[in-house]
UniProtKB/Swiss-Prot annotation:
Residues 293-417 form the Nop domain. GO terms for biological process: rRNA processing. Pfam families: Nop, NOP5NT. One of its GO terms (molecular function) is snoRNA binding. This is Nucleolar protein 58.
């Protein structure tokens, strides 16, 4: 049985002795000593690498499972077999099995050279022993020299892989933008902690200095608020803020803190300052990386938005495979699927919303602008991804992105003109400043004046200027009282008229002059008439009910007769 091994020296074929069984569980004991290893394996043939470049080429092909021409000729000369499926006639065919470490390479050798191969988990102990005793098996090779050759070849192979890796720069951009987001969160958390901590000592300072980094620098320079008067803030703050800060420090309502408290606050300020400085360096690094990997995309949407798009897609090549519609909503997948589920309108933009071209567009045109920016961004991404590395480093590499940006800006101005929207960028004031200026507020109309004479209290018996108003109030009260009296009188008249008409059936002329006995007799007669009327109504209802009952009985009898006839 023959064993193929890849080493830093070259390809080596060993002859496995008949005493050493490859399926033996104790095979590793044969390689505990150099003597045992030489007894189990003998060098059958060796093909040395002529140069580092050829070694890198052959080993890269072997790792990919490909069979190079040099390795194919070496195996044909050493093991035998058939070249390109044709049987070899001149050379003697060797009927021995070849052990290969890589299963993919083993399948390629068997298919191309018709050599029986073995590559499974049972060969792991064998190759582990070969690597352990390789110097003694090769014979005459120093272990230090072998290690040096392996190290040099490993470095060359790694450089070769990195050189042709399509994701090598994408990884740097993805990690940089993720770290930038983390640093922003850390700076925000630490800065808020500094403000809350130092606010017990100087609470007014948080309203005067809004910037977090400037706040930390001022706290670091000033220390206790009593030192504000003697501290020079000219390098940190403008003159007006410096004067406001010093005056507020003298009248502060904060509590006193100890030296140990101030020491810890200073340490936290150092953390905020150092992290902010590193964030500036990282931002510059990211900008340079984006200029190198995607100059057109950077010129169109900026380095931060471009880096976030690449990070979300996974790599520049994956981003180049997306259509413009996907680039437009990239980052808004959650809102997209929620809209599809609820059958609502889908989102118009995702991460691309933070591009400056969309930010400067009016709210009415943001959706249309996002669609146009995504279209041009898709073209720029494909140019960056599929162009050569040398062309990306050229000065004119961002020509496509710059030209697309100019077109989009002119298109935005045209859309604003069509919609009748005045752009903020076009407005120029009289003094040459950009943007709309708020008009100065001016008082208009006639303003009233205060009557100071009403403040004087008269010492004599004269009436006050407001006294005549009491007569008008009295007249209003009298009018209200008269209205109430008239209303009560009308209600009483209506009530009396109702009492008279209650007995409308009786003779009113007799009611006025009748006695008690006559009134009693009249009431009894009236009751008797009502009772007779009620009895007559009840008798009429009884006749109706009896007639209805008789009709129902007749219908029931007819139904019974019909049923009997059917039964018969």
């Amino acid at each position: 049985m023959l064993v193929l091994t890849e080493t830093s020296v070259g390809f080596v074929v060993f002859k496995l002795s008949s005493d050493a069984k490859i399926d033996n569980k104790d095979l590793w004991k044969e390689f505990e000593t150099p003597e045992g290893a030489n007894k189990a394996l003998k060098v059958q043939a060796i093909q040395r690498f002529t140069s580092t470049a050829s070694a890198v080429e052959d080993l890269t092909a072997v790792q990919d499972g490909r069979l190079t021409d040099s390795l194919s000729r070496f195996l044909l000369d050493t093991v035998g077999g058939a070249d390109d499926g044709e049987k070899k006639k001149k050379k003697k065919k060797i009927e021995e099995m070849l052990v290969v470490s890589d299963p993919k390479l083993a399948g390629t050798i068997n298919k191309a050279l018709s050599i029986p191969v073995l590559s499974d988990s049972s060969t792991q102990d064998l190759y582990r022993g070969i690597r352990q005793q390789l110097a003694s098996l090769l014979g005459g090779v120093d272990q230090k020299d072998l290690n040096t050759m392996s190290l040099g070849l490993g470095h060359s192979l790694s450089r070769f892989k990195l050189k042709f890796s399509t994701d090598k720069v994408d990884t740097m951009v993805i990690q940089a933008i993720a770290l930038l987001d983390d640093l922003d969160k850390e700076i925000n958390i630490y800065a808020m902690r500094v403000k809350e901590w130092y606010g017990w000592h100087f609470p007014e300072m948080a309203k005067i200095i809004v910037d977090n980094i400037a706040f930390a620098r001022v706290v670091k320079a000033m220390g206790f608020r009593t030192n504000a008067v003697t501290t020079d803030f000219s390098l940190l703050l403008p003159e007006d803020l410096e004067a406001t800060l010093k005056s507020a420090a003298e009248l502060s309502m904060g509590t006193e803190i100890s030296d140990s408290d101030m020491t810890h606050i200073h340490s936290l300020c150092d953390q905020v300052i150092s992290i902010s400085e590193y964030r500036t360096q990282l931002s510059e690094y990211l900008r340079n990386r984006m200029q190198a990997i995607a100059p057109n995309l950077t010129a169109l949407v900026g380095e931060l938005v471009g880096a976030r798009l690449i990070s979300h897609a996974g790599s520049l090549m994956n981003l180049a495979k997306h259509p413009a519609s996907t680039v437009q909503i990239l980052g808004a997948e959650k809102a997209l699927f929620r809209a599809l589920k609820t059958k609502h309108d889908t989102p118009k933009y995702g991460l691309i919303y933070h591009a400056s071209l969309i930010g400067q567009a009016p709210q009415k045109l943001k959706g249309k602008m996002a669609r146009m920016v995504a279209t041009k961004a898709a073209l720029s991404i494909r140019v960056d991804a599929l162009s050569d590395a040398d062309s990306r480093s050229d000065v004119s590499a961002a020509e496509v992105g710059i030209s697309n940006r100019v077109k989009l800006e002119s298109r935005l101005r045209a859309l604003e003109h069509q919609a009748g929207i005045q752009s903020v960028r076009k407005v120029v004031s009289a003094n040459g400043q950009q943007g709309r200026q708020q008009p100065r507020f001016e008082m208009s109309g006639v303003t009233g004046s205060y009557n100071a004479a009403t403040d004087n209290v008269p010492l004599n018996g004269d009436l006050l200027p407001t006294q005549p108003a009491t007569e008008e109030v009295k007249e209003e009260k009298d009018e209200k009282k008269d209205k109430k009296d008239k209303k009560k009188k009308r209600k009483s008249e209506v009530a009396e008229a109702g009492d008279v008409t209650m007995d409308g059936d009786a003779d009113l002329s007799m009611v006025a002059g009748e006695t008690k006995e006559e009134r009693r007799a009249r009431k009894e007669a009236k009751k008797a008439a009502k009772a007779a009327k009620k009895a007559a109504e009840e008798s009429g209802d009884g006749d109706k009910k009896s007639k209805k009952r008789r009709a129902d009985e007749d219908e029931d009898s007819e139904k019974k007769k019909k049923k009997k006839k059917k039964d018969e």
